[in-house]
Amino acid sequence: MTSDSTVDKILAGKYPAKQHAENVVERLLHVHPDLTDGVIYLESQRSKLYENSDQEVPFRQRRYFYYLSGCDLADSYLTYSIRDRKLTLFIPPIDPASVLWSGLPLSNSEALEKYDVDEVLPTSATALPTTSYSSLMFVIESQTSRTFHLQNTESLEPAIERARAIKDEYEVALIKKANRISALAHHSCLRAIKSAGNEREIEAVFTKECIANGAPKQAYSGIFGSGRSASTLHYVHNNQPLAGKLNLLLDAGAEYNNYASDITRTFPISGQFTKESREVYDIVLDMQKQCLAASKAGAVWDDIHILAHKVAIQGLLKIGVLRNGSVDEILSNRTSTAFLPHGLGHYLGMDTHDCGGNPNYADPDPMFKYLRKRGPLPAGAVITVEPGIYFCEFIIKPYLEDEKHAKYIDKDVLNRYWDVGGVRIEDNILITEGGYENLTNVAKEVDDMLKFING
């Protein structure tokens, strides 16, 4: 894994906006091979107020705009001339009234020094007749406030999404930084669990550690699910007492400069796993290790997802939750989706569920319906590997009532596992030609976790 000093050295440079613009043009050329002229036009997120209030809504930059600018300012624009290879950023001019409350904004010269662009102009410079652009304008229709005489609204968004699927060195460094901050927060939560009385206390520990280490934003709403709440995949109430619960499933990650981390660990609240919890944990850890070992450029993600199910079935047969069938038979009947209903992982980048994965949510096969990445893995992709086993009564009950599945499930044995709730283990990896680099350094071996918990 790259050292902290190397990551910081990379991030001391500029976000590579011009290279990203070239990446997008390269994808546009796949669709428009004769393209020699044209302008990419993107708008940043607008500043907004809450309804009937003068309080600003928390700002989140548009990811398409950020990818081509590295600029986190509201009410801005950019153009990229394909013919001239010129990237121009337009930022709001100084508003004397707002300086009173918010201080001086970034000047044009400061922005030119900060961002990887060729020119910085005030946004008033874009208040031009649309006929001033004689070239074809590539825009994202839903994120554009103006109409141009010649415009293409179909090609830009998919071109950016395809480009974003492959991360460069700078983007990987941002994700590594987010992971390292999240690792500090996860380990602080392990240390705090035995003295905590409520899920929200652990969420507070996690958030505090992220903010203290330079990541004030979370990549997504964290999951701090104790006991049976861990069987709800996106449980976000985070307000239940911990007393009497076996385990805590902690799925949370910091965002660093608009890039996400996404890490899950499951651990015993008391400092010791029960027999049933340890059995399930060991199965899930084996699932993850085997899936990690299979991950490399060219490997088909669908096949690795099937591998996760096969290992899960083997483990559940061993502990007796599943019975009366071979691994292949139970797999072909899709009974394992009762215990692993989600996909193995998803692309990670500026969005937690990042673009470019080519999912098919209309797939009639329940094993693949929620798989957010389909097809072969390319080198340079960052993806999560997050197998899990869950004991959710609402999900499993229909399987128990369907003879197709019920014959494979031992209800008496299953009853011993409801309180385990759910176990998920999730790391973020960079796909390489020969395998992968794990960007996540959070304890997951049982002995390592227990050292943090028990001091």
Swiss-Prot record:
Belongs to the peptidase M24B family. GO terms for biological process: proteolysis. Keywords: Aminopeptidase, Hydrolase, Manganese, Metal-binding, Metalloprotease, Protease. Binds 2 manganese ions per subunit. The keyword NAD does not apply. It catalyses: Release of any N-terminal amino acid, including proline, that is linked to proline, even from a dipeptide or tripeptide. Mn(2+) 2 binds at residues 251, 262, 426. Mn(2+) 1 binds at residues 262, 386, 426. InterPro entries: Aminopep_P_N (IPR007865), Creatin/AminoP/Spt16_N (IPR029149), Creatinase/aminopeptidase-like (IPR036005), Pept_M24 (IPR000994), X-Pro_dipept-like (IPR052433). PANTHER family: XAA-PRO AMINOPEPTIDASE 3 (PTHR43226), XAA-PRO DIPEPTIDASE (PTHR43226:SF1). Its EC number is 3.4.11.9. Its cofactor is Mn(2+). This is Probable Xaa-Pro aminopeptidase GSTUM_00008071001. It comes from Tuber melanosporum (strain Mel28) (Perigord black truffle). Catalyzes the removal of a penultimate prolyl residue from the N-termini of peptides. Pfam families: AMP_N (PF05195), Peptidase_M24 (PF00557). The keyword Repeat does not apply. GO terms for molecular function: manganese ion binding; metalloaminopeptidase activity.
